[in-house]
Amino acid sequence: MQNSSLFEVMLRRVLIMQIYETIRETIPSGALELSAIVVTLHDAKKRRKKMMQSIRSCVLPLAMLTGGVFYGFFSRFSTAIPYFIFTMLLLTFCKLAPKDVKFKKLHLWLILIQILGSIAVYLIVSLFDTVTAQGAFICILAPTAMAAAVITGMLGGNVAFLTSYVLVSNIGTALAAPVIFSFMGPNTEMPFTDSFIYICREVMPLLILPLLAAWTIRAAAPPLHRALLKINPVTFYLWAFSLTIVTGRTVKFLSEQQNPDYTTEISLAAIALAICLAQFKAGKYIGNRYGERIAAGQGLGQKNTILAIWMSQMYLNPVASVGPASYVLWQNIVNSYQLWIKKNRDDKCASSHEARKK
């Protein structure tokens, strides 16, 4: 019995060794090939992502440079800007489900700062220069950028809160802008009622209808809604082309001025920088009290500058558009700095974690 048992044990060992050798000889080659393919695909994906990030980082200066150099050509397309804004908002709101919209007290504080702050700054700066005051005003009144939710996510903030504020911000601007614009710019020459109705007819549909259209499509035509979600990346290219057009229109107006006032233009760029930094700081300060430091900072600081430039060119002194045009650059520098800080912090945390492991 003992010999039989010993024989069975030895036989099992031999069989196990044979199976092991077979696996080692046959599978590794295929496994290595498969592993190599997986690694290659992963590396290719990482390289593609880095390449896209590099391309996107170059699009801002390239779009502004192209619009500035070829302003005569691109300024001809300025009538298309409202349609581009509508399309970008529609695609953005397609990602926002009604059930995800949750209003909080902080949303109210932020929209009050956005609307009342813009009026207060205008009244103060207008004591020195009206055009500079208009540029400062529009940099604050402009609604939150559609891309702010993306940056908020990259910084580790509450994307749901910020997405809800994009909605609040657009509705607030749509309601406030017609009233405020009626008291400044060329619209002051018209009776208030006529001016209000005229601006309402252009601004409110541009900001409200995309939301209504997106939610109607979501409920009534799910296949179309899914198709719109798939082409959502198109918003980036629409934004780039829109930036080229509004830059071209701004440069065209400035170059055709009979009596250019470079002091005003420099003042507009400088005050846009001050307002940009102040809005990011104020948003973070008040947001910190509600546990939404990052999201509130982006909500107040990152603006829909395409819309701001278009509104200033349509309803204010066109020179005032230098303010939001400069704001494009300032807010992107701030965002780049914030992302760099976040990356360095994450790298340090990862390094210290690895060190503790060792």
Predicted stretch roles:
Residues 3-6, 12-13:
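N-terminal amphipathic/hydrophobic targeting modules at extreme N-termini
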Residues 8, 21, 36, 43-44:
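Short hydrophobic alpha-helical segments enriched in small aliphatic residues
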Residues 8-9, 33, 39, 355-356:
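Low-complexity, intrinsically disordered segments with a bias for serine/threonine
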Residues 9, 25-26:
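N-terminal start and proteolytic maturation junction detector
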Residues 13-19, 41:
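N-terminal polybasic/positive-inside topogenic patches
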Residues 41-358:
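Alpha-helical transmembrane segments of multi-pass small-molecule/ion transporters
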